[in-house]
Amino acid sequence: MDPVQIRSLSLEALAYLGDAVWELHVRTRVLLPPRRLQWLHGDTVACVRASAQAKLATCLSPHLTVEEADWLRRGRNAGGTVPRRLDPATYRLATAFEALLGYLFLADRDRLGVILHLCDEFQHHHGPDTPSPEA
């Protein structure tokens, strides 16, 4: 997709795509070592929840290019209805993270790989997130 087409997409559409990119990446990552399905699901949920994504968005910030930081900022400022169970700031950062991944998936797969690797390293060393009581 060319840059003009990417810029024509809504931030919500990029976040929609980025959500799928992140979910598939995490599902692939947790497959090894082989474990029971319930553990795979639990590990995946811990990594893809909004609070974990918001944490990643914050940690990625120093590693982003100017253009990527702009996509993250735009994603954070995008409109949308915040689910009642979530803090608005957390939801907006998670949406920003997803929008950035959606943008990179369309614009630069090599850079997407670098960003996903940084996310993996961060979650490996710091854990995905503290599970919420509702989960």
From Swiss-Prot:
Keywords: Cytoplasm, Endonuclease, Hydrolase, Magnesium, Nuclease, Ribosome biogenesis, RNA-binding, rRNA processing, rRNA-binding
SUPFAM superfamilies: RNase III domain-like (SSF69065)
MF terms in GO: ribonuclease III activity; rRNA binding
One of the GO BP terms on file: rRNA processing
Signal sequence bounds: none
InterPro entries: Mini3_fam, RNase_III_dom, RNase_III_sf
Listed EC numbers: 3.1.26.-
Primary enzyme class: hydrolase
GO CC annotations, alphabetized: cytoplasm
Active-site feature positions: D19
One Pfam family here: Ribonuclease_3
Cellular location(s): Cytoplasm
The protein's required cofactors: Mg(2+)
UniProt function note: Involved in correct processing of both the 5' and 3' ends of 23S rRNA precursor. Processes 30S rRNA precursor transcript even in absence of ribonuclease 3 (Rnc); Rnc processes 30S rRNA into smaller rRNA precursors.
Subunit structure: Homodimer.
Family the UniProt entry places it in: Belongs to the MrnC RNase family.
Name of the protein: Mini-ribonuclease 3
